[in-house]
Protein backbone atom coordinates (compact mmCIF):
# COMPACT_ATOMS: atom_id res chain seq x y z
CA UNK A 1 0.00 0.00 0.00
CA UNK A 2 1.67 3.15 -1.12
CA UNK A 3 -1.05 5.63 -0.62
CA UNK A 4 -1.31 9.35 -0.58
CA UNK A 5 -4.24 11.70 -0.20
CA UNK A 6 -4.32 15.44 0.37
CA UNK A 7 -5.06 15.76 4.08
CA UNK A 8 -3.67 17.95 6.79
CA UNK A 9 0.08 18.18 6.72
CA UNK A 10 0.69 14.93 4.88
CA UNK A 11 0.33 14.02 1.24
CA UNK A 12 -0.88 10.50 0.59
CA UNK A 13 -1.76 9.19 -2.86
CA UNK A 14 -4.05 6.14 -3.03
CA UNK A 15 -2.59 3.94 -5.76
CA UNK A 16 -4.81 3.34 -8.82
CA UNK A 17 -7.70 4.93 -6.95
CA UNK A 18 -10.24 5.18 -9.77
CA UNK A 19 -9.26 1.83 -11.31
CA UNK A 20 -9.50 -0.19 -8.08
CA UNK A 21 -12.81 1.37 -7.01
CA UNK A 22 -14.27 1.00 -10.51
CA UNK A 23 -13.25 -2.65 -10.35
CA UNK A 24 -15.64 -3.13 -7.43
CA UNK A 25 -18.58 -2.23 -9.69
CA UNK A 26 -20.21 -0.50 -6.72
CA UNK A 27 -23.87 -0.96 -5.85
CA UNK A 28 -24.95 2.21 -3.97
CA UNK A 29 -26.82 0.04 -1.45
CA UNK A 30 -24.11 -2.60 -1.13
CA UNK A 31 -21.78 -3.73 1.65
CA UNK A 32 -18.06 -3.19 1.06
CA UNK A 33 -14.82 -3.88 2.91
CA UNK A 34 -11.58 -1.93 2.59
CA UNK A 35 -9.07 -4.37 4.09
CA UNK A 36 -6.25 -1.82 4.25
CA UNK A 37 -7.55 1.59 5.36
CA UNK A 38 -4.18 3.38 5.57
CA UNK A 39 -5.21 7.04 5.44
CA UNK A 40 -8.59 6.33 3.89
CA UNK A 41 -8.06 7.29 0.27
CA UNK A 42 -9.82 4.24 -1.14
CA UNK A 43 -12.42 4.26 1.64
CA UNK A 44 -13.34 7.88 0.86
CA UNK A 45 -13.78 7.04 -2.82
CA UNK A 46 -16.00 4.04 -2.00
CA UNK A 47 -18.16 6.15 0.34
CA UNK A 48 -18.60 8.69 -2.45
CA UNK A 49 -20.21 5.94 -4.54
CA UNK A 50 -22.51 4.62 -1.79
CA UNK A 51 -26.06 5.72 -1.05
CA UNK A 52 -27.64 6.10 2.38
CA UNK A 53 -28.17 2.35 2.74
CA UNK A 54 -24.63 1.43 1.69
CA UNK A 55 -22.10 0.21 4.25
CA UNK A 56 -18.31 0.23 4.41
CA UNK A 57 -16.12 -1.60 6.91
CA UNK A 58 -12.47 -0.55 6.87
CA UNK A 59 -9.76 -2.65 8.53
CA UNK A 60 -6.25 -1.70 9.60
CA UNK A 61 -3.81 -3.11 12.14
CA UNK A 62 -1.87 0.15 12.47
CA UNK A 63 -3.01 2.16 15.53
CA UNK A 64 -2.10 5.39 13.71
CA UNK A 65 -4.55 4.51 10.92
CA UNK A 66 -7.29 3.90 13.48
CA UNK A 67 -6.65 7.26 15.12
CA UNK A 68 -6.77 8.93 11.72
CA UNK A 69 -10.08 7.27 10.86
CA UNK A 70 -11.62 8.24 14.20
CA UNK A 71 -10.58 11.86 13.68
CA UNK A 72 -11.49 12.23 10.01
CA UNK A 73 -14.31 9.82 9.14
CA UNK A 74 -17.60 10.78 10.77
CA UNK A 75 -20.08 8.90 8.58
CA UNK A 76 -22.88 6.58 9.75
CA UNK A 77 -22.20 4.31 6.77
CA UNK A 78 -18.57 3.80 7.84
CA UNK A 79 -16.96 1.63 10.51
CA UNK A 80 -13.26 1.13 11.29
CA UNK A 81 -11.96 -2.17 12.70
CA UNK A 82 -8.58 -2.35 14.42
CA UNK A 83 -7.00 -5.66 13.49
CA UNK A 84 -5.52 -7.76 10.71
CA UNK A 85 -7.49 -8.60 7.59
CA UNK A 86 -6.44 -12.18 8.35
CA UNK A 87 -9.47 -12.13 10.69
CA UNK A 88 -11.87 -11.09 7.90
CA UNK A 89 -14.03 -14.18 8.44
CA UNK A 90 -14.61 -13.30 12.12
CA UNK A 91 -15.37 -9.67 11.31
CA UNK A 92 -18.00 -10.73 8.78
CA UNK A 93 -19.51 -13.37 11.07
CA UNK A 94 -19.84 -10.83 13.89
CA UNK A 95 -21.92 -8.61 11.59
CA UNK A 96 -23.86 -11.45 9.92
CA UNK A 97 -22.30 -10.45 6.59
CA UNK A 98 -21.04 -13.83 5.35
CA UNK A 99 -22.25 -14.28 1.78
CA UNK A 100 -23.57 -10.72 1.70
CA UNK A 101 -20.47 -8.72 0.78
CA UNK A 102 -20.65 -6.82 -2.53
CA UNK A 103 -16.98 -5.96 -2.78
CA UNK A 104 -13.60 -6.27 -1.07
CA UNK A 105 -10.57 -4.07 -1.71
CA UNK A 106 -7.08 -5.15 -0.61
CA UNK A 107 -4.18 -2.71 -1.05
CA UNK A 108 -1.07 -4.63 0.02
CA UNK A 109 2.31 -3.62 1.35
CA UNK A 110 3.51 -0.68 3.42
CA UNK A 111 1.73 2.68 3.38
CA UNK A 112 3.61 5.89 2.67
CA UNK A 113 3.08 7.19 6.24
CA UNK A 114 4.70 4.02 7.58
CA UNK A 115 7.65 4.42 5.23
CA UNK A 116 8.02 8.11 5.96
CA UNK A 117 7.90 7.75 9.76
CA UNK A 118 11.41 6.73 10.83
CA UNK A 119 10.16 5.41 14.17
CA UNK A 120 8.24 2.63 12.41
CA UNK A 121 11.50 1.08 11.21
CA UNK A 122 10.46 0.29 7.63
CA UNK A 123 12.86 2.59 5.79
CA UNK A 124 16.54 2.04 5.05
CA UNK A 125 16.84 5.75 4.19
CA UNK A 126 16.03 7.04 7.69
CA UNK A 127 17.50 6.07 11.04
CA UNK A 128 14.94 4.45 13.30
CA UNK A 129 14.42 1.44 15.55
CA UNK A 130 14.44 -1.96 13.87
CA UNK A 131 10.72 -2.57 14.20
CA UNK A 132 8.90 -3.15 10.85
CA UNK A 133 5.68 -4.36 12.50
CA UNK A 134 2.44 -3.26 10.83
CA UNK A 135 0.97 -3.33 14.34
CA UNK A 136 3.68 -2.26 16.80
CA UNK A 137 1.51 -3.43 19.68
CA UNK A 138 1.92 -7.13 18.96
CA UNK A 139 4.47 -9.70 17.78
CA UNK A 140 8.25 -9.59 17.47
CA UNK A 141 10.02 -6.51 16.18
CA UNK A 142 12.56 -6.95 13.39
CA UNK A 143 15.39 -6.58 15.90
CA UNK A 144 13.91 -9.27 18.15
CA UNK A 145 13.29 -11.54 15.18
CA UNK A 146 16.85 -11.10 13.87
CA UNK A 147 18.19 -11.92 17.33
CA UNK A 148 16.20 -15.17 17.53
CA UNK A 149 16.46 -16.47 13.97
CA UNK A 150 19.40 -18.71 13.04
CA UNK A 151 21.69 -17.90 10.12
CA UNK A 152 20.40 -20.70 7.87
CA UNK A 153 16.75 -19.70 8.31
CA UNK A 154 17.62 -16.04 7.78
CA UNK A 155 19.37 -16.89 4.52
CA UNK A 156 16.31 -18.84 3.38
CA UNK A 157 14.04 -15.90 4.23
CA UNK A 158 16.23 -13.45 2.30
CA UNK A 159 16.26 -15.75 -0.71
CA UNK A 160 12.56 -16.66 -0.65
CA UNK A 161 10.98 -13.37 0.39
CA UNK A 162 13.57 -10.95 -0.97
CA UNK A 163 14.75 -12.93 -3.99
CA UNK A 164 18.22 -11.92 -2.81
CA UNK A 165 21.10 -13.49 -4.78
CA UNK A 166 23.60 -12.99 -1.97
CA UNK A 167 21.32 -14.27 0.80
CA UNK A 168 23.90 -16.50 2.49
CA UNK A 169 26.60 -13.86 2.60
CA UNK A 170 24.21 -11.17 3.84
CA UNK A 171 22.71 -13.48 6.49
CA UNK A 172 26.18 -14.25 7.83
CA UNK A 173 27.08 -10.56 8.11
CA UNK A 174 23.76 -9.73 9.78
CA UNK A 175 24.15 -12.46 12.41
CA UNK A 176 27.72 -11.35 13.11
CA UNK A 177 26.47 -7.78 13.64
CA UNK A 178 23.74 -9.07 15.97
CA UNK A 179 26.26 -11.03 18.05
CA UNK A 180 28.53 -7.99 18.27
CA UNK A 181 25.51 -5.83 19.23
CA UNK A 182 26.12 -3.57 16.25
CA UNK A 183 22.59 -3.88 14.90
CA UNK A 184 20.43 -1.30 16.68
CA UNK A 185 18.84 0.85 13.95
CA UNK A 186 17.55 0.64 10.40
CA UNK A 187 20.65 2.43 9.14
CA UNK A 188 22.85 -0.09 10.96
CA UNK A 189 21.11 -2.89 9.06
CA UNK A 190 21.30 -1.02 5.76
CA UNK A 191 25.03 -0.48 6.21
CA UNK A 192 25.67 -4.13 7.07
CA UNK A 193 23.79 -5.28 3.97
CA UNK A 194 25.55 -2.74 1.75
CA UNK A 195 28.97 -3.91 2.93
CA UNK A 196 27.98 -7.56 2.47
CA UNK A 197 26.71 -7.08 -1.10
CA UNK A 198 29.45 -7.71 -3.68
CA UNK A 199 27.35 -6.16 -6.46
CA UNK A 200 24.70 -3.46 -6.56
CA UNK A 201 21.71 -3.02 -8.85
CA UNK A 202 21.32 0.19 -10.80
CA UNK A 203 18.64 2.47 -9.30
CA UNK A 204 18.09 0.10 -6.35
CA UNK A 205 19.53 0.39 -2.84
CA UNK A 206 21.48 -2.76 -1.84
CA UNK A 207 19.27 -3.20 1.24
CA UNK A 208 15.95 -3.08 -0.64
CA UNK A 209 15.50 -6.84 -0.95
CA UNK A 210 16.69 -7.57 2.59
CA UNK A 211 14.32 -5.05 4.16
CA UNK A 212 11.44 -6.46 2.11
CA UNK A 213 12.24 -10.02 3.16
CA UNK A 214 12.53 -9.24 6.87
CA UNK A 215 9.34 -7.16 6.81
CA UNK A 216 7.43 -9.99 5.12
CA UNK A 217 8.72 -12.48 7.68
CA UNK A 218 8.00 -10.28 10.71
CA UNK A 219 4.42 -9.62 9.57
CA UNK A 220 3.79 -13.07 7.97
CA UNK A 221 2.54 -11.11 4.97
CA UNK A 222 2.33 -13.89 2.39
CA UNK A 223 0.58 -16.33 4.72
CA UNK A 224 -1.91 -13.63 5.70
CA UNK A 225 -2.50 -12.82 2.02
CA UNK A 226 -3.31 -16.45 1.21
CA UNK A 227 -5.76 -16.56 4.11
CA UNK A 228 -7.61 -13.37 3.18
CA UNK A 229 -7.98 -14.45 -0.45
CA UNK A 230 -9.60 -17.73 0.61
CA UNK A 231 -11.88 -15.95 3.08
CA UNK A 232 -12.85 -13.30 0.54
CA UNK A 233 -14.37 -15.94 -1.72
CA UNK A 234 -16.33 -17.34 1.24
CA UNK A 235 -17.84 -14.02 2.33
CA UNK A 236 -18.58 -12.44 -1.07
CA UNK A 237 -22.09 -12.71 -2.48
CA UNK A 238 -22.65 -13.96 -6.03
CA UNK A 239 -21.53 -11.14 -8.31
CA UNK A 240 -19.39 -9.62 -5.55
CA UNK A 241 -16.04 -8.22 -6.63
CA UNK A 242 -12.50 -8.57 -5.28
CA UNK A 243 -9.91 -5.89 -6.14
CA UNK A 244 -6.32 -6.59 -5.07
CA UNK A 245 -3.35 -4.24 -5.50
CA UNK A 246 0.06 -5.84 -5.03
CA UNK A 247 3.49 -4.22 -5.05
CA UNK A 248 6.01 -6.96 -5.68
CA UNK A 249 6.22 -10.19 -7.65
CA UNK A 250 5.76 -12.50 -4.64
CA UNK A 251 2.40 -10.94 -3.76
CA UNK A 252 1.24 -10.72 -7.35
CA UNK A 253 2.20 -14.33 -8.02
CA UNK A 254 -0.02 -15.48 -5.14
CA UNK A 255 -2.96 -13.33 -6.28
CA UNK A 256 -2.60 -14.41 -9.91
CA UNK A 257 -2.33 -18.10 -8.97
CA UNK A 258 -5.33 -17.87 -6.64
CA UNK A 259 -7.58 -16.29 -9.24
CA UNK A 260 -6.46 -18.79 -11.85
CA UNK A 261 -6.98 -21.81 -9.57
CA UNK A 262 -10.36 -20.68 -8.27
CA UNK A 263 -11.68 -19.90 -11.74
CA UNK A 264 -11.03 -23.42 -13.06
CA UNK A 265 -13.10 -26.58 -12.86
CA UNK A 266 -11.34 -29.02 -10.52
CA UNK A 267 -11.40 -32.79 -10.69
CA UNK A 268 -10.79 -33.92 -7.11
CA UNK A 269 -9.66 -37.38 -8.22
CA UNK A 270 -7.91 -36.85 -11.57
CA UNK A 271 -6.28 -40.31 -11.59
CA UNK A 272 -9.50 -42.21 -10.93
CA UNK A 273 -10.95 -44.19 -13.90
CA UNK A 274 -14.37 -42.99 -12.75
CA UNK A 275 -15.24 -39.31 -12.51
CA UNK A 276 -16.17 -39.10 -8.82
CA UNK A 277 -16.50 -35.40 -8.09
CA UNK A 278 -15.91 -32.14 -9.89
CA UNK A 279 -15.69 -28.76 -8.16
CA UNK A 280 -17.06 -25.88 -10.19
CA UNK A 281 -15.15 -22.59 -10.35
CA UNK A 282 -16.08 -20.08 -7.64
CA UNK A 283 -14.73 -16.88 -9.20
CA UNK A 284 -13.99 -15.49 -12.62
CA UNK A 285 -11.24 -13.14 -13.69
CA UNK A 286 -12.43 -9.66 -14.62
CA UNK A 287 -10.35 -8.12 -17.39
CA UNK A 288 -6.58 -8.02 -17.58
CA UNK A 289 -4.11 -6.89 -14.92
CA UNK A 290 -4.16 -3.11 -14.51
CA UNK A 291 -1.01 -1.03 -14.10
CA UNK A 292 -0.56 2.61 -13.01
CA UNK A 293 -0.61 5.20 -15.77
CA UNK A 294 2.56 6.99 -16.77
CA UNK A 295 1.16 10.14 -15.18
CA UNK A 296 0.50 8.39 -11.86
CA UNK A 297 4.01 6.92 -11.79
CA UNK A 298 5.46 10.39 -12.33
CA UNK A 299 3.28 11.89 -9.60
CA UNK A 300 3.80 9.01 -7.17
CA UNK A 301 6.96 6.98 -7.96
CA UNK A 302 6.05 4.42 -5.27
CA UNK A 303 3.16 3.27 -7.48
CA UNK A 304 5.46 2.05 -10.27
CA UNK A 305 5.52 -1.59 -9.19
CA UNK A 306 1.78 -1.83 -8.47
CA UNK A 307 -0.49 -4.38 -10.17
CA UNK A 308 -4.28 -4.48 -9.81
CA UNK A 309 -6.15 -7.75 -10.36
CA UNK A 310 -9.94 -8.07 -10.20
CA UNK A 311 -12.14 -11.14 -9.76
CA UNK A 312 -15.89 -11.75 -9.39
CA UNK A 313 -17.71 -14.35 -7.28
CA UNK A 314 -19.89 -16.69 -9.34
Swiss-Prot record:
Chief place where the protein resides? cytoplasm
The alphabetized UniProt keywords are:
Cytoplasm, Methyltransferase, rRNA processing, S-adenosyl-L-methionine, Transferase
Q: Where in the cell is it found?
A: Cytoplasm
- Name one molecular function that GO assigns to this entry: rRNA (cytosine-N4-)-methyltransferase activity
Please tell me where S-adenosyl-L-methionine binds in this chain: 40-42, 60, 85, 107, 114
Q: Which Pfam families match?
A: Methyltransf_5 (PF01795)
Q: Which family does it belong to?
A: Belongs to the methyltransferase superfamily. RsmH family.
Kindly provide the name given to this protein in its UniProt entry.
Answer: Ribosomal RNA small subunit methyltransferase H
User: What gene is this protein translated from?
Assistant: rsmH
Amino acid sequence: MSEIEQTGQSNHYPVMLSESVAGLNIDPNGIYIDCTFGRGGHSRAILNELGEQGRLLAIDQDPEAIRYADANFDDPRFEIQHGSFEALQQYCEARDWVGKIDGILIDLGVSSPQLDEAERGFSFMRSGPLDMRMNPQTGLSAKEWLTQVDEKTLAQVLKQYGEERFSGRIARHIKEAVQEQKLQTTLDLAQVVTKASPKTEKHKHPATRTFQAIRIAVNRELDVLKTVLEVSVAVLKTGGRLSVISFHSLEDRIVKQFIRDQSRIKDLFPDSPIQLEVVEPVIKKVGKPVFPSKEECQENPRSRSAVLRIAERI
